[in-house]
Amino acid sequence: MMKKIDVKILDPRVGQQFPLPTYATSGSAGLDLRACLDDAVELAPGATTLVPTGLAIHIADPSLAAVMLPRSGLGHKHGIVLGNLVGLIDSDYQGQLMVSIWNRGQDSFTIEPGERIAQMVFVPVVQAEFNLVEAFDATERGEGGFGHSGRK
């Protein structure tokens, strides 16, 4: 299913010098977001920085949200992940997409202008209404959590 989402280009290099986000394959779930930087940024081990994408989106549909996720290769090979682990973009947000990047690796990492730094996935949203109760109906699991089912 394809859905149209309003996007605003905030930096004229996006779509020219830096490609617009696209799906790499027909089966891709995520769109790659790029670093819209003037110069390379050196990120020391343990450091975080906010990187602009040069884009703003307005999802508008309250049954959708977007999540920003790390790129698997950056995390596995270089220890580069999102500073907030997952970024949530609500349907009514209209500001620039900024990516919080954390270097959890042992070496400095350089973020180059135009580099693919994160991916964005659109997800369905269900807003819940709480029903206050005194007790729950019993289930097999009950209150068991955090490893209650073992490792094997």
UniProtKB/Swiss-Prot annotation:
<dbReference type="GO" id="GO:0006226">
    <property type="term" value="P:dUMP biosynthetic process"/>
</dbReference>
<dbReference type="Pfam" id="PF00692">
    <property type="entry name" value="dUTPase"/>
</dbReference>
<keyword id="KW-0378">Hydrolase</keyword>
<feature type="binding site">
    <location>
        <position position="84"/>
    </location>
    <ligand>
        <name>substrate</name>
    </ligand>
</feature>
<comment type="pathway">
    <text>Pyrimidine metabolism; dUMP biosynthesis; dUMP from dCTP (dUTP route): step 2/2.</text>
</comment>
<keyword id="KW-0479">Metal-binding</keyword>
<keyword id="KW-0460">Magnesium</keyword>
<dbReference type="InterPro" id="IPR029054">
    <property type="entry name" value="dUTPase-like"/>
</dbReference>
<dbReference type="GO" id="GO:0046081">
    <property type="term" value="P:dUTP catabolic process"/>
</dbReference>
<dbReference type="GO" id="GO:0004170">
    <property type="term" value="F:dUTP diphosphatase activity"/>
</dbReference>
<dbReference type="InterPro" id="IPR008181">
    <property type="entry name" value="dUTPase"/>
</dbReference>
<comment type="similarity">
    <text>Belongs to the dUTPase family.</text>
</comment>
<feature type="binding site">
    <location>
        <begin position="71"/>
        <end position="73"/>
    </location>
    <ligand>
        <name>substrate</name>
    </ligand>
</feature>
<dbReference type="GO" id="GO:0000287">
    <property type="term" value="F:magnesium ion binding"/>
</dbReference>
<dbReference type="InterPro" id="IPR036157">
    <property type="entry name" value="dUTPase-like_sf"/>
</dbReference>
<feature type="binding site">
    <location>
        <position position="98"/>
    </location>
    <ligand>
        <name>substrate</name>
    </ligand>
</feature>
<keyword id="KW-0546">Nucleotide metabolism</keyword>
<feature type="binding site">
    <location>
        <begin position="88"/>
        <end position="90"/>
    </location>
    <ligand>
        <name>substrate</name>
    </ligand>
</feature>
<protein>
    <recommendedName>
        <fullName>Deoxyuridine 5'-triphosphate nucleotidohydrolase</fullName>
        <ecNumber>3.6.1.23</ecNumber>
    </recommendedName>
</protein>
<comment type="function">
    <text>This enzyme is involved in nucleotide metabolism: it produces dUMP, the immediate precursor of thymidine nucleotides and it decreases the intracellular concentration of dUTP so that uracil cannot be incorporated into DNA.</text>
</comment>
<dbReference type="InterPro" id="IPR033704">
    <property type="entry name" value="dUTPase_trimeric"/>
</dbReference>
